[in-house]
Amino acid sequence: MSSTTTSQSVSPFELFLRRFKREKLAILAGSILLIMVLMAIFAPFFLSQGLNDFDYDKILMPPSAENWVGTDLYGRDLFTRLVYGARISLSVGFLSVTFGALLGSVLGIMAAYKGGWLDTIIMRAADVLFAFPSFLLAIAIVAVLGGGIVNVIIAIAIFSTPTFARITRSSALAVLNSQYVRAATTMGASHFRIMFVHILPSTIGGILVYFTMRVGTSVLTAASLSFLGMGAQPPSPEWGAMLASSRDFIAVDGYMYLTLYPGLCIFLTVLCCNVLGDGLRAALDPK
């Protein structure tokens, strides 16, 4: 009897935490991402060199005790630029996916709740966007809007929206005829309250998992656009822009560190986001 009472008194959030604590790799990935975020935020407090401190006596210096990952072709400290670059790369990833998630969630829940012609229009529009490879769609959008970080965020948000709409719609349809939604309808709750107070919370799990994974993909997409000259422009320390400015040294012996470390930052971010997303999925939806 006591065990039954104890199990009933545990909240869903507590159950989630218990399951998530078993996901050691996800916790490690989340810790690495947290360290990267904190380093990016507090960069001015622990970095001794400025973002664009030129030192022509230290041009293309290899990693050393003074310059941990070396210097670039202008004598700037690469570690400093990588940390400041995390501000841009992580911000682009987070903001673009946030905007896509907000818009997609609203469209998805409206499609599920209203149904009919509105559902058809929203889902067919999503199908049109799904017909194009996401990266090519991002290139097309940036080509129309012009280069720059803001337009990259807009482009990534646009092609992130359909998937969030699909996830939200699917989750919302699963609870649309549940007892608590029917009770809210019977009590005269407004459509807005039913959609965003009673239905939306049940979709958060799927949204959160995809959101986490999508941030990593968005960082990679933004870096790719910058590498092609369509995103952040030099002297921006965005990781893709750093790769672009050092592309002539990719195959040059002794200077591979110029592209190695920005590439590792991108790889580590994408990997950690995917591992964290897998851990969240396992904790939210145990099989």
Range-by-range predicted roles:
Residues 1-105, 109, 117, 135, ...:
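Gly/Trp-centered helix-boundary motif
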Residues 36-37, 101, 127, 143, ...:
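Residue-level recognition of pore/gate-forming positions within transmembrane alpha-helices
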Residues 68, 72, 78, 102-104, ...:
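Generic hydrophobic transmembrane alpha-helix motif, especially the helices
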Residues 76-91, 95, 115-123, 176-177, ...:
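Amphipathic cytosolic juxtamembrane alpha-helices at the membrane-cytosol interface
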Residues 136-140, 144, 148-157, 207-242:
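Non-cytoplasmic
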Residues 161, 165, 218, 269-273:
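Alpha-helical transmembrane segments
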